[in-house]
Amino acid sequence: MDLQAINSNFKNFLEEVGSYYSVVDDQEVQILRKKQDDCYQNFLDVHYEYTKCISQIDDKYSSLNKTFKFKTEKAAKSYKSCLQNKKVEECHERTWKHLHENMKQYISLLRRIDTQTIKY
């Protein structure tokens, strides 16, 4: 065998080996890319659920705060109208009783929302 034939055979061998490794690399890269895409999709799904949950919790806090503000304003108006007809002590006691009940409900609902937040 002459030197040119040996070089040609060796070159063909290297190309064959190279093509084998490029196929293996391509397959491994495709597998890794698939895993990466799956992970990214899972991340997007989890992120979407988390964002949706946070939005719902924000809505609940907002609604709860509006309700509490409304009840507090209602109690203040009730206190003013009460003062026109009754003694200050009687109005004061009645108003504080309403405000205390409102505050207990508010705290109870806040705890319930916080419990839901912890679940996520």
Residue ranges and their predicted role:
Residues M1-Y120:
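Mitochondrial intermembrane space
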